[in-house]
């Protein structure tokens, strides 16, 4: 066999840089009620590998919404996690989470307020 065949067969692991997770109070409150430490670690590990996995929230200046399984439910009926990835600071802010059946989507005013909070942190 040719050497090039062996090179194609080798799969290198993806290198993940260090990332700091910052949990805001609304997220902490949700997590304490609905998730174990293992659930949080699963979310963090997922975001380390796929930090841009959630849908961008229109008008949210980079805020993202991720569907995530909660309390034995699948993603569709589970939780929504609102987060922000601050690329240059290598941080992911876990801002807010809610169970889909208990709350509707965020209002425009809430989105604007959260976007401003993240902008202030970036600028300050």
Give a label for each model feature.
Residues 22, 38, 77, 90, ...:
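Charged, alpha-helix-enriched surfaces in structured cytosolic catalytic cores
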Residues 7-8, 85-124:
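Enriched for short, Lys/Arg-rich terminal
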Residues 30, 46, 114-117:
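Residues that form generic nucleotide/phosphate-binding pockets
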């Amino acid at each position: 066999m040719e050497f090039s065949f062996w090179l194609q067969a080798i799969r290198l692991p993806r290198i993940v840089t260090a990332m700091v997770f910052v949990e805001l109070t609304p997220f902490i409150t949700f997590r304490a009620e609905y998730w174990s430490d293992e659930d949080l670690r699963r979310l963090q590990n997922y975001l380390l590998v796929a930090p841009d996995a959630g849908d961008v929230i229109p008008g949210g200046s980079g805020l993202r919404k991720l569907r995530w399984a909660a309390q034995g439910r699948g993603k569709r009926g589970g939780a929504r996690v609102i987060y922000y990835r601050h690329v240059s600071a290598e941080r992911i802010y876990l801002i807010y989470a809610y169970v889909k059946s208990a709350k509707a989507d965020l209002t425009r005013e809430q989105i604007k307020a959260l976007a401003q909070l993240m902008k202030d942190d970036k600028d300050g």
